[in-house]
Amino acid sequence: MITASGGGDTGALRAPGEAPVDVRPQAAAPDEEAGPGGGPAPSRGGSFLARAALVTAALSVAGSLLGLARDQALAHFFGAGTDTDAFLVAWTVPEMAATLLIEDGLAFFLVPAFSLALAQRGRGTGRDPVRALVAASLPRMCLCFAAAALVLALAAPWVVAALAPGLPDQRLAVDCTRLTATCALSFGLAGYCSAALRAHQRYTVPATIYVVYNAAIIATLALLAARWGVRAAAAGVAVGGALMVVAQVPSLVRQLRSGRGTGGSPAPAEPPSTRLRTTVIWTVLLFALCRQSQVLIERFLASSLPGGAISHLNYAQKVAQMPMALALMLCTVTFPVLARAQAEGQTLKARDRVERDVVMAGCVVLLGAAAVIAGAHPIIQLLFERGAFTPEDTAATASVMRVYSLGLLGHTLVGALARSYFAGGRVTWAPVTAMGLGIVATAGLGVLSVGTFGVYGIAASNAIGICLTATLLLRGMGPRTVPIRIPKVVAELAGLVLAAAVATLLGALCARSLTAPVPALLACGPTVLLTFVLVGWSLRVGPLVSAVSALGPALRKLASRHDR
């Protein structure tokens, strides 16, 4: 039901008598600059993007660490048993809502829409197109979000039965689902604010939302876990979702008030195709829904396994996905820049941006995957083995995490490449088709393997399915999207994969030589990092060559300061 939040006819988003707001890219003068009155943000250079990426990375890491603390609290209070499984079925709702409404679906449509409106604002004629877009879309989207939340709450028993038919305590899962259903509204509003702020090149406030969200869940668990049980975690989701909106609204209001506009009638515009804009929304939301349906498949298959299987898979994914989240953070920062380049017809700039983003994201995620696979057991032992979380849970979760991590590069490439397909605001069914084929592969392989390999078969099916999708998306990059140089990108990614494989092997040998988790990680981490950088540098992989080249002058400068 969440897809109803954005799937209607966008012609209905216009107030009576208003001119339509086109979200398709149009050519704009390349020399447009922002005026002091709040026109489109001027073209930002690499230093601005680097600072924005650094701040966003710091806040993303803080949010991820709080996410780990949230999972630690959940493991401490409830372990990896049937109560946790019941909550994790309800947790599917905020997971899907985050993908559809914050991270992928809504952002893939709204960031290009706001980027185009900002480009039109620079012409300084007629009504402010940014305010027109907000007035046309936000009220009706709010109604859609609220309706989706209400339907989810009322349909909770059927949702739980469909997601996990083999779950022992379905009543507890229903209670948790009704509490988490509120995020269909709160996440929708948070995603709207986040997309608008990022299009204005305001990154700090949107990057704080998961810090606020996870802190709220932890606080609610601490206050209510003894009385409400695992329902306290679901209540924390509801509170955290509301706080994500509250954190962003003041900043968005300031951006809208600073916008330049004459306040007159809108300038005449070429009537856009409402059908086209509606199709754009559907392609974006269907892609995001297909991508998130991997979680539904995993939970469905794992519900028939012994108690704790869903929890082991969940904890493994939460840790393994941290490198992916950090890698895609860069793409989140540069997505508005890519959308603006597409809107202004700057194809070469868009191509270079995509190539850099894909290789850099691959570099970050493969380094993280190498560390996660090599140090899986001590990582899980250090993070979760306390309270009701037993050594057997540690061993099972670490093993699943190693298998799941094999698909991290695929997950990252899908996230990075999908932004390239949707940045222009054009209709494209390629991402949906590729994701659909990947989902079919995931489901088919999962059904065939779960009986024999259990949760490991589910994790392996996930990795294979997402890698198939990534391959199809990469092959589909061409003139209708962003015409990147595929052989060049593949060659650099292959070098990074080889570097990660060598680093994983050496890191695992170091980790296994020590039994205590902290010494094992202190030996494993630097080994993985050093090996990855040296092997990648020897293979002349771009980001690592640049990193090593920059390291020499930095060390010499530091040494000269020390000599003084």
PLM regions and their residue ranges:
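Transmembrane helical elements of multi-pass membrane transporters/channels
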Residues: R51-Q72, G240, M244, Q248-Q255, ...
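Hydrophobic alpha-helical transmembrane segments
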Residues: I209-R254, L437-T442, V455-G476, T527
